[in-house]
């Protein structure tokens, strides 16, 4: 149920791919994948890099994106999208895929890719809402207690499949679907979600066509608005205060007006992407599975020492035997030279 763009020609979104990025950008990209917990750099951050806004935006966003309150807000958005998808009606699709010639292993591979983007798109909408408000005076900073400020584990989940993308300049049925996606989303290019699912052209054609049947229904438009409002509300309740000064953008070489316009493009597109992927997930695995995070964090098994946030201005409590400065060896044996 991707957010529908106007019928006019859409300018292609400028991005900086990894092969074009300088060393500093690559370093930020690596941090992004670890903190967002996904195997490829999301399109949002490549587009920010093209506007020379990646460094200040990531510096502001990073403290918020790494806390439990952010992760759980994205979980809530994902669950809401699944409920809205069920309300729109989305019959199970596995039988159609078998008729299309896909075997069990191929359907599992499709499921693995749907899980990735069903997981990450909700986090990206949260990130966009945080950044947009951060540029308009600031957002967040609501006291939530130590639970909300607990750190999210770093790194890609071990059970997340690799992401393999097909080229955008596809042929045949896939080329037709990709043209529709470019126009429909208002980004002028095909997001990674659909380039990953493009490995199975018949599936993507079926799923995309089915999702588009609902676009003009009032309940579908209301669902998109509800997802956007929910993300805005969740961003406002984060425990970490996020602000971006226009001077910081200009110092990095970015135009604040262009950065705002970029964020608005993603703000329009992402509620629909979230709803589309929720539809795809419900069609594959049913409503109950779609409401759950595909890559849940087992918080009770996480070491509080490693993942509990300590404020920058708070003294760090040392344990017995911890070194108090760099000159102390902490009781370690001296190396023999």
Task: Label every PLM stretch briefly.
Residues 1-337:
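Hydrophobic alpha-helical segments
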